[in-house]
């Protein structure tokens, strides 16, 4: 059975990926690691094996990997897009310094390394519709710059040293468990909370601004799927486009109204996040992921909306 380490385990994806990996591989085969003290974390992370570690501390991370004979690492440490614009130097240090440390350790210890890229790796010159797997990127955010550099680093370490690097380009991720963490696509999570609590939402992204989105169950499916895939089928290896649904604010509002008929929405545009959103594609072409490792999402906008409202209503309203 695989021994798996998840670094950045307390983030939006990690906090849900860890329980899912433990369900699949067994609680004792999945180690969660994060900078935070265990007392700050959800029981789902610390009930199993947990190690406190800074990804920039190479010796500490290497010690953990050796201690548990780790076969696969999911690297989920990152400062997200809007936070990265406020702290660009820190974004570079964490996003790329942490990745470089893991790549160097992987070169020595020979484990699989999953590092996600993002829709944020694209820029204004990128084709907006059905964005190809291989195309011009040229992002305009520091987050995007670190993601493109990360894609290239992972390719380099595979070609130069044979490190088994794998990854996908995630769209905006929508979760019913974890709160948003400073991303441009966070409106598509916030809107459900406000719809349930206030039946109204003030949106910071303009009407008509399309972005690729994905429900968390499909996000986990993509991460685990590419790590379990037969790499002999790969033409690409890192940064596979994975898509699920593309919508703009009016469409998500309409989907919510099907469940909460008196829901209303107005706008107060955030120029920083709007500018980032406009630089990204409307929809990615994920045909390479479908062909090379059988990627297929399970949720569309309506089925996700029904599930989000059902789950969040129980939690927020005790229904």
Model-derived segments and their meaning:
Residues 4-24:
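N-terminal Rossmann NAD(P)H-binding glycine-rich loop of SDR-like oxidoreductase domains
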Residues 75, 100-142:
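Conserved Rossmann-fold NAD(P)-dependent oxidoreductase catalytic core, especially the SDR/UDP-sugar
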Residues 146:
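Active-site helix of classical SDR
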Residues 45-56:
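Rossmann-fold cofactor-recognition segment
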Residues 155-210, 216-221:
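NAD(P)-dependent short-chain dehydrogenase/reductase
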Residues 7, 33, 73-79, 113-119, ...:
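SDR active-site strand-loop-helix element
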Residues 204-206, 211-319:
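C-terminal substrate-binding subdomain of Rossmann-fold SDR/epimerase-dehydratase oxidoreductases
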Residues 55-94:
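NAD(P)H-binding glycine-rich loop region in Rossmannoid oxidoreductase-like domains
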């Amino acid at each position: 059975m695989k021994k798996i380490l998840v670094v950045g385990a307390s983030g939006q994806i990690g906090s849900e990926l860890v329980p899912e990996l433990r369900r699949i591989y067994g609680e004792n085969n999945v180690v969660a690691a994060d900078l935070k003290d265990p007392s700050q974390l959800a029981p789902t992370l610390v009930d199993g094996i947990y190690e406190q570690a800074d990804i920039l501390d190479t010796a500490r991370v290497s010690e953990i990997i050796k201690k548990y004979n780790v076969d696969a690492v999911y690297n989920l440490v990152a400062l997200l897009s809007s936070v990265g614009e406020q702290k660009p130097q820190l974004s570079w240090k964490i996003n790329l310094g942490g990745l470089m440390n893991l790549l160097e350790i992987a070169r020595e210890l020979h484990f699989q390394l999953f590092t996600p890229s993002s829709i944020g790796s694209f820029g204004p010159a990128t084709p907006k519709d059905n964005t190809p797997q291989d195309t011009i990127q040229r992002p305009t955010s520091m987050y995007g710059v670190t993601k493109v550099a990360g894609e290239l680093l992972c390719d380099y370490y595979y070609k130069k040293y044979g490190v088994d690097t794998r990854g996908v380009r995630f769209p905006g991720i929508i979760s019913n468990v974890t709160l948003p963490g400073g991303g441009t696509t966070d409106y598509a999570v916030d809107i459900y909370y406000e719809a349930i609590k206030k039946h109204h939402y003030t949106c910071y992204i303009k009407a008509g601004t399309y972005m690729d989105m994905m429900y968390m169950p499909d996000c986990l499916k993509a991460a685990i799927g590419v790590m379990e895939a037969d790499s002999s089928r790969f033409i690409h290896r890192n940064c596979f486009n994975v898509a699920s649904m593309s919508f703009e604010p009016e469409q998500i509002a309409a989907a919510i109204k099907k469940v909460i008929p008196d829901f209303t929405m107005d706008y107060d545009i955030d120029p920083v996040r709007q500018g980032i959103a406009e630089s990204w594609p409307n929809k990615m072409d994920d045909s390479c992921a479908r062909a090379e490792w059988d990627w297929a999402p399970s949720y569309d906008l309506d089925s996700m909306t029904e599930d989000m409202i059902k789950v969040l209503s129980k939690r927020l309203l005790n229904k």
